[in-house]
Curated annotation (Swiss-Prot):
Its cofactor is Mg(2+). One of its GO terms (biological process) is tRNA processing. The lineage of its organism: Bacteria, Pseudomonadati, Pseudomonadota, Betaproteobacteria, Burkholderiales. Belongs to the ribonuclease III family. InterPro entries: dsRBD_dom, RNase_III, RNase_III_dom, RNase_III_sf. This is Ribonuclease 3.
Length: 227
């Protein structure tokens, strides 16, 4: 294994049984068809579950809505970007020439996606317990306290709380299209609420941004329907 990847293992505190997973986790789609997008998808779910469990234990008296808001603050792009910098991911990312020249190695969305991909890679390599352990390690330096609930709600959190307040299932987000050059992509995401047979779409320069736009559009639909 290359020395830089071996050093990343040490920072993650996880030794990979399948080193190819680690290599894939730091490979952007602009570099290869064997890239980290599917790992990112998996890691997003592992991250949310691990953080949910952590908050449930640490903030035992906090109501559900506030827990959702704290979690949204913890797993947002800005937090994951800071974790990526601590892991020194800009030195490790494999990007296509165009993406690299356009500053992709410093782009917060790409770095945040790589953190999720690493979590997904650990999960595939050794299971959920190992993935949860790595998540807890990565968030050791992140402040987790009840005051985070006072932060402004983003659209996804607001939509989730609206549905939970009516005992409805959470919305499903799906990337339905990706357009543009690898270094300047636009993502289109569909947000669906099956119980209401509603769907809204949004676009953005990253999956996260597109999900927020789709959630905003869905909130507008709900507002119009329930006005």
């Amino acid at each position: 294994m290359p020395p830089l990847l071996n050093a990343l293992q040490l920072r993650l505190q996880h030794q990979f049984a399948e080193p190819a997973l680690l290599q894939r986790a730091v490979t952007h789609r602009s570099f290869s068809a064997d890239n980290n997008e599917r790992l990112e998808f998996l890691g997003d779910s592992v991250l949310n579950l691990a953080i949910s469990s952590l908050l449930y234990q640490r903030l035992s008296s906090m109501p559900e809505g506030d827990l959702s808001r704290v979690r949204a603050n913890l797993v947002k792009e800005g937090t994951l970007h800071q974790i990526a910098l601590r892991l020194q991911l800009p030195d490790l990312l494999r990007l296509g020439e165009g993406e690299s020249k356009s500053g992709g190695k410093q782009r917060p969305s790409i770095l945040a996606d790589a953190v999720e991909a690493l979590i997904g890679a650990v999960y595939l390599d050794a299971g959920y317990a190992a993935g949860e352990k790595v998540v807890h390690h990565l968030f050791e330096g992140v402040d987790i306290n009840p005051h985070m609930r006072a932060a402004e709600k983003d659209a996804k959190t607001a939509l989730q709380e609206w549905l939970q307040g009516r005992r409805m299932k959470l919305p499903q987000y799906e990337v339905v299209a990706t357009t543009g050059a690898a270094h300047r992509q636009t993502f289109e995401v569909a947000c669906a609420i099956a119980e209401l047979q509603l769907q809204a779409r949004g676009t953005g320069a990253s999956r996260r941004a597109a999900e927020q736009t789709a959630a905003t559009a869905m909130l507008e639909l709900l507002k119009a329907r329930h006005a």
